[in-house]
Amino acid sequence: MYESISVYHVDFSASSLFVSKFGVIRTFFFLPDNEVNAMSRSHPLQSQLFPPYAAALCGGAGLLLLLLALCRTAGLSDAPSRLPVGLCLVLLCALAAGLLFYEDRRPGAALFALLPIGLALFLRALCLEHVTYDYRDFLSGWASFFRENGGWAAVALPKGNYNVPYLYFLAAISYLPVRDLYLIKLFSMLFDVLLAWGGYRLVRRLSVPGSYCPCTAFCILLLLPTVVLNGAYWAQCDSIYGALCLHALASALDRRPAGSVVLLALAFSFKLQTVFLVPLWGALWFAGRVRFRDLLLFPATYVLTIVPALFLGKPLGDILGVYFGQAAEYSDYLTLNAPSLYALIPYGAEVDTTLAARLGILAAFLFTVSILLWLLLRRGRLTDRALFTAGAAFAVGIPLLLPHMHDRYFFLADTITLCWACLDRRRGIPAAILVQVASLG
């Protein structure tokens, strides 16, 4: 006897993501290498600095927005948290501007970027007080549990369904006299900045020298709706694994294979959804970009992330069972507000859940194998752009086909397609818009 379930609603944003997915595949499979390599040249090379007066105006406007953000923190409901949160916003602004100047070395670009940086922090300051059901029912209880059970000592106890690196964070903040809601959101906001930095590095690798495409990616990633909402509004932590994945991909294309594998393993230690991008390292291996001994750093790094928990007394079975528990938690639902193909099933339709899920898993497997096979056949002449496009196809296509997906599982697809849009306006912008609309839908 098969299980059956009534599909509760139809999310037609899945159709837009379906179109976007095949736009990515078309770029990868059907464009010749010379055109693929020339995609970023749709942006003219900009050799002149920004006009000084315009840069000064943008810098001043950005600082004004930062001041407004600080005014917002001065009115937070938890009075002891106001000053620490305000200082954290200032530090985040300094970090974002400093990273951009470190990478770009053009003062005009850094001054111009203060405007989107200030706006990004202002929008996040407006979101700090918002409490979601997920935070109220789960994260709040976990944070309180760590405060009440000895902080680091509580890591050994069976609380929370996140992997141990995030539990280390919850243990660390349990000693701080700041409201947990703000600390959790600020931690994600820190990785929002690191995510933008990863986008900068990735786009810089694929764009022509002197282009402002990397700066554009940095600024837009900070303002991307799903990035702003994920951490500052929903108190989620997808920017952590997203940032690490972008840096891993950038490092791989920069011919830093060992570092890329370590970053990928760190991303996996935070979020299981990193597996959407993992197949790309198989392509990097048979293309000679990554050695087998480099791949061994993945399990080694993961083991290092769980060693502190083992020393604190947490059973190995509890650690290794986290991701299996997450996978089983939503096994009764074909989709949880995710813009996957299952969202196209009409409202009220009776569906054989087991069969539909197996077909989706098979489709995702065949999709992944087909791209890897194509890359294998072209391994002697793979370009950075071809590898990047394959990564984008994995990030969009795998969660599109898999069952049991949550809407936030497209976070990586949102960020990678945004980087693509900064590189190629004609093809990338429509894909990025479709993916973003689907994620928010």
Protein language model regions, located:
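Extracytoplasmic catalytic/substrate-binding loops of multi-pass membrane glycan-assembly enzymes
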Residues: 128-142, 157-169, 331-341
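Perimembrane helix-loop-helix junctions
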Residues: 276-300, 310-312, 412
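Membrane-embedded helix bundles of polyisoprenyl
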Residues: 120, 213-250, 260-273, 298, ...
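Specific aromatic-rich, kink-prone transmembrane helix
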Residues: 197-201, 240-257, 416-417
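Loop-to-helix entry region of an early transmembrane alpha helix in multi-pass inner-membrane enzymes
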Residues: 164, 168, 178-197, 353-363
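Transmembrane-helix motifs of polytopic, lipid-linked glycan transferases
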Residues: 186-208, 367-377
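Start-transfer (signal-anchor) and selected internal transmembrane alpha helices
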Residues: 35-125, 204, 214-216, 383, ...
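Aromatic/glycine/proline-enriched transmembrane-helix motif characteristic
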Residues: 99-105, 109, 205, 327-401
